[in-house]
Amino acid sequence: MKNILRVVSLAVLGMIGLKAQTASVVRAGSYEVGGFVGASYGIDKSRFMGGANVTYAATKWILPYTEFSYFPGIGRRQSRTIPGLTRPVDISYNIPLTDFHGGVHIRIPIRELPIVPYGVIGVGMIHAPERQINVNVEGIQVKLPVEASTNAAVNFGGGLRYYINQRFGVRAEAKLYKPSGQFKETFGKVEFGFFVQLR
């Protein structure tokens, strides 16, 4: 009888401990710091990108965040006047972008499971550096200047977090960007990353 009570007591204590550990994985008042890599999708094809972000769990559901991303190449289209031609021509080219923005993750805990879906919305600035581009216009290679630009952009999307334990986790996210300014083409990114949860 004592052995049975001992086994039952250990099982109950183990369940309580597991419940407490699971419940404490998704908690308010913690920071998440992490990096990510993925692919960006512009007007033509996908390209590698990466970045990092920091979130703060104001509550178990609301996480304000800041994020930096670098896109080595985003496709763009533009109508330009070419020397020697009497009419404007449409050109396509790739240019690197940097994105810095803030927003909020809306986390949706499901019965304290370690897998947590979330939505995201943000607003910030996208910067394209000044550079020279080479384009082919009617069989002729032409070098054109591209001015630097910094424009506001909104973004939205969603993803999944998986909390490996109370300290570490991984996440996958998909997001669309809508820039303002001269280049208004919507582009997106799909990313996978890790994070460290700090209290």
Q: Which role does the model predict for each range below?
A:
Residues G35-A39, A52-Y56, G102-I106, I121-M125, ...:
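Residues on the lipid-exposed face of transmembrane beta-strands in outer-membrane beta-barrel proteins
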Residues T55-E138, V190-R199:
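Gram-negative (and chloroplast) outer-membrane scaffold detector with strong preference
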Residues K2-L10:
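Sec-dependent signal peptide recognition
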Residues F36-D44, P72-G75, R111, M125-E130, ...:
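Sequence/structural signature of outer-membrane beta-barrel proteins
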Residues Y31, W61-T66, E112-P114, Y162-V170:
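Repeated loop/turn-to-beta-strand initiation elements of outer-membrane beta-barrel proteins
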Residues G29-Y31, S46-G50, N94-F100, I115, ...:
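Residues that define the transmembrane beta-barrel architecture of outer-membrane proteins
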Residues K19-A58, P64, V123, E191-R199:
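Short glycine/proline- and aromatic-enriched beta-strand/turn motifs that initiate or cap beta-hairpins
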Residues G38-S40, L85-Y93, I140-V146, Y177-Q182:
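Extracellular loop and loop/strand-boundary signature of outer-membrane beta-barrel proteins
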